[in-house]
Amino acid sequence: MNTENLLIIDGSSFLHRAYHGYANANIIDESGRQISAIYGLVEMFRKLERKITSTAWICVFDPAKSKSFRYDIYPEYKKNRTKYEDLEYQKEIVPKIVSHLGITTIVDDRYEADDIIGTLAVSLFDKCSSILIATGDKDLAQLVNNKVKLINTMNDEVTDIKGVNKRFNVNPEQIIDYLSIVGDTSDNIPGVLGCGAVTASKLLQEYKTLDEILKNIENLKPSIKTKFINSSKE
């Protein structure tokens, strides 16, 4: 595989978007099961192919049935998400279909797509001139660097280091700490109650890391200090 200009696709993100975007397509297979999301996914790939020139594509999916280690750490993880029966079947068969399109496809029962995408971005860094990650997931902003960029195919917006700075007011390497403070509602992960994006970015601009914020908790404004202490008790 020539990975000089690599495109990594967050297949699970694409499939969920296709499920909602093509909800009225009503496309069924020979057994009468809905496959509108898969049809939409393929259409999204076609549009992507017209927009992007890459020497290699890799598409990564979440496991369809098994749960990652995150559920053991935090049982409430993603508990707020609605399950759609007609999507669950499509999750099971889509990796094989994408593979038949000639696209390198990866799914691992132990890990989510994000984990694998992160591993690929790091392990293939020295072998690539550029890595473009197609996703709508803000978590992956932590991977952005001088070679790695994100593209949101909803609006064709490409996010580089400056783009991360502009959107979050922090650097890519601070995204994990930023999300730890503000929380992630899409994954049902609480942050520091009462600390929003503005507070989080200001704290990280001053102290650089969450560890340093906690080490200097006595120096924080009383109201912010209280929020951190109260959140640590929950």
Where do the PLM segments sit?
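Noncatalytic, basic helical substrate-engagement surface that gates or grips nucleic-acid strands
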Residues: 2-134, 140-158
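Non-catalytic nucleic-acid-binding/docking modules located in mid-to-C-terminal regions
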Residues: 3, 51-58, 82, 101-103, ...
